[in-house]
Amino acid sequence: MNEKHPGPLVVSGKLSDGERMKSESNFLRGTIAEDLNNGLTGGFSGDNFLLIRFHGMYQQDDRDIRAERAEQKLEPRHAMMLRCRLPGGIITPQQWLGIDKFAADNTLYGSIRITNRQTFQFHGILKGNVKPAHQLLNELGLDALATANDVNRNVLCTSNPVESALHQEAYEWAKKISEHLLPRTRAYAEIWLDAEKVATTDEEPILGATYLPRKFKTTVVIPPQNDVDLHANDLNFVAVADKGKLIGFNVLVGGGLSIAHGDKNTYPRKASEFGYIPLKHTLAIAEAVVTTQRDWGNRTDRKNAKTKYTLERVGVETFKAEVEKRAGVSFSAIKPYQFTGRGDRIGWVKGVDKKWHLTLFIENGRLLDYPGRSLKTGVAEIAKIHQGDFRLTANQNLIVAGVPEKDKARIEALAREHGLMDDNVTSQRENSMACVSFPTCPLAMAEAERFLPEFVTRVEGILQQHGLADEHIVLRVTGCPNGCGRALLAEVGLVGKAVGRYNLHLGGNREGTRIPRMYRENITADEILLITDQLVGRWAKERHVDEGFGDFVIRAGVIAPVIDSARDFYDVQEAM
């Protein structure tokens, strides 16, 4: 535990404008309902531009045509991205068919994007289709409440179909945590579902009238898999089992990856171990962590508002003691746990329940019908006959779960027919990931999703050239320092700096338990590949048995490990 810099429990000073917006929003209503009927613009204006995020949407535009439209004196082509709340990533085939049809009929791009937070996004919903989108989700038994902005976001849960009973228990807790921490305001139901307006004052007993200081992310993790990247999250419940039965959780708090270029007061941070709790205290601890962050988080500076900064300011032990006090629970010592990897097991695996589970690799999570590979149609065809469920993974893949032996051949035939199973996909491609970035993300500084496939092809060539064709490096590209692509937990992480330029980070590990350090700043893809070629050449010759690339570059002295990111993340480390 690190108590080097204890500071004030509450940061004084002028509140950020985001706090004003929330306090004046009437519990997230704003004037969204009126704005919906304003046909003079395709977007939401004023505070509503940000308030719609609490309702699961971001206002975006097509940046590929932004300049062209400006020349024509037209406003940007505004469209919304809508993100579903899907704790643990489980969705039924019937629900899938509903979202498949909506994407085809009512979005500009016609695609479904599986995210690395185990849900799906629609991109390109025009303003007139926004309300029908929410109503469709509601008809399917889904919603988009609290999938963005200053609330507890979609709760992740390890996708472990083999240990079916344990996964089911963990998944149930992910759902309970999600429901417990949801906003209580009726704004979502009133605006999107035409719920009757009730003459009572809204109350937010957990989140408070101005909600949280910043976004808050929660996971339920089943070791030895760390597919959900717990160190990217504010609150983590690491499953502890006895004889295959869930008995409690190790609790880790204060992870997070987003930074701001040029601002050394921002840094990534691994989550800190608080201790072990039995199952019965799970919701009390979740609530206590959230309310402590609600009350102590920095509301004067949004760049310094996340839980990780609160922990560094007040000290881990102080924060932990407050959580114990609020929950009326004392943490026990952490129970032993270990992570061995993060990747999904692509292909068929048989669970202890004798059912089969097929993990389909979906490059960058983008389901669309491409020439010769009708991926989106293929998943829909599987949904028409599948009797189990679908599970969206934190690696942006799709699991067809709970397949009886008699249906296995038929489902595989459909998957192969539509290009969803490809025996030629390399381990390197399976272990590479990017955020959406251009053309829809307004924060994008460099390409990510559109850049990754060809970049991976070139990395595959380097591995093959050095006799490592069957090896892989955990490779991630994020289009800006907000870090949605989780590049700052990769062995090789690219963080977008400008169009065509990235900061290159090296030295994470395969398990996702070490933050990579910046090795080169603001360089091109060609420069990155040249460095990769040189270092992979050394890795091929000098590595120990089963030594991953990230571990190798640390051991070989290419770069020093990040030990305490709040203090050493920006230390300059010259290559040896």
Swiss-Prot record:
What does the record say about how the cofactor binds? Binds 1 siroheme per subunit.
InterPro entries in UniProt? CysI (IPR011786), NiRdtase/SiRdtase_haem-b_fer (IPR005117), Nit/Sulf_reduc_fer-like_dom_sf (IPR036136), NO2/SO3_Rdtase_4Fe4S_dom (IPR006067), NO2/SO3_Rdtase_4Fe4S_prot (IPR045169), NO2/SO3_Rdtase_4Fe4S_sf (IPR045854), NO2/SO3_Rdtase_FeS/sirohaem_BS (IPR006066)
Positions bound to [4Fe-4S] cluster: 435, 441, 480, 484
Q: Species name for this entry? A: Yersinia pseudotuberculosis serotype O:1b (strain IP 31758)
Q: What is this protein called?
A: Sulfite reductase [NADPH] hemoprotein beta-component
- State the pathway, as annotated in the record: Sulfur metabolism; hydrogen sulfide biosynthesis; hydrogen sulfide from sulfite (NADPH route): step 1/1
The UniProt keywords, alphabetically, are:
4Fe-4S, Amino-acid biosynthesis, Cysteine biosynthesis, Heme, Iron, Iron-sulfur, Metal-binding, NADP, Oxidoreductase
Question: What's the catalysed reaction?
Answer: hydrogen sulfide + 3 NADP(+) + 3 H2O = sulfite + 3 NADPH + 4 H(+)
Q: What class of enzyme is it?
A: oxidoreductase
Q: Quaternary state and partners of this protein? A: Alpha(8)-beta(8). The alpha component is a flavoprotein, the beta component is a hemoprotein.
Which GO BP terms apply?
Answer: cysteine biosynthetic process; hydrogen sulfide biosynthetic process; sulfate assimilation
A molecular function annotated in GO for this UniProt entry is:
metal ion binding
Alphabetical list of Pfam families matching this protein = NIR_SIR, NIR_SIR_ferr
Which EC number applies? Answer: 1.8.1.2
Q: Name one GO cellular component term.
A: sulfite reductase complex (NADPH)
